[in-house]
Amino acid sequence: MNAVEQISGYGLSATDEPVQLPARPEPLAMKASETALIVVDMQNAYASRGGYLDLAGFDVSATQPVIAKIRQALNAARAAGMQVIFLQNGWDNGYVEAGGPGSPNWHKSNALKTMRKRPELAGTLLAKGGWDYALVDELAPQPGDILVPKPRYSGFFNSQLDSTLRARGIRNLVFTGIATNVCVESTLRDGFHLEYFGVVLADATHQAGPEFAQQAALYNIETFFGWVSSVDAFCQSFAAAPEVAVAS
């Protein structure tokens, strides 16, 4: 090959071998270079007292262990050279992106309903630029991480997530975050229909609602849409994987 010749294409230099991630219903073979760790909506709205879920009457008392597990998964992913993507749910300050009365989102979003019930909260919940919308301090993105805003439960709806993943040759999505039965499951389901392999790290997620909502979501994922694993299994599987370059 002439010294000035170039070959185009993402992943031409990727030499990492697949690892076998223990999961249900069966192990899943994955390469770090073809995998992204997805952190779903780890915002004050969903994980902090005084945030939207808390104000809407949902129990957020168990979110701190989830934050710790996600940090553990993030450390392993970054060490393996895996792409990290944060999803961030919310709307513009005027809530135009929320859809208005002509959208079912206006009628079903508990954040919007809470603000209508409590006018003193108007403009504070899931509004871009506000504390509620912000990611929790413990999970601040690092250089090389990607942040994808989203206006609905699914991270694929009206966002650049799909094109971001495809441009990097990513086929496997490892999910963490809140809420398992809402935004995590919605994004994983949509990914399934777009031919992505989705696996959720169960102990790095938390449901909105009672415990049976968590178990039902995990059952749906394991049985119909993807795989279920754990943070320890993820970390151990990729601990021996050689670090690969992440395209930015």
From Swiss-Prot:
Cytoplasm listed as a keyword? no
Per UniProt, the keywords (alphabetical) are: Hydrolase
Does this entry carry the keyword Hydrolase?
yes
Provide the E.C. number(s) assigned to this enzyme: 3.5.1.110
Query: For this chain's UniProt record, which GO biological process terms are given?
Result: nitrogen utilization; uracil catabolic process
Q: Which Gene3D superfamilies does the UniProt record give?
A: Isochorismatase-like
Q: Can you tell me which residues form the catalytic site?
A: 41, 150, 183
Q: Which reaction does it catalyse?
A: (Z)-3-ureidoacrylate + H2O + H(+) = (Z)-3-aminoacrylate + NH4(+) + CO2; (Z)-3-ureidoacrylate + H2O = (Z)-3-aminoacrylate + carbamate + H(+); (Z)-2-methylureidoacrylate + H2O + H(+) = (Z)-2-methylaminoacrylate + NH4(+) + CO2
A GO molecular function for this record? hydrolase activity, acting on carbon-nitrogen (but not peptide) bonds, in linear amides
Concerning its family, UniProt says: Belongs to the isochorismatase family. RutB subfamily.
Q: Can you name this protein? A: Ureidoacrylate amidohydrolase RutB
Query: Which gene is transcribed and translated to give this protein?
Result: rutB
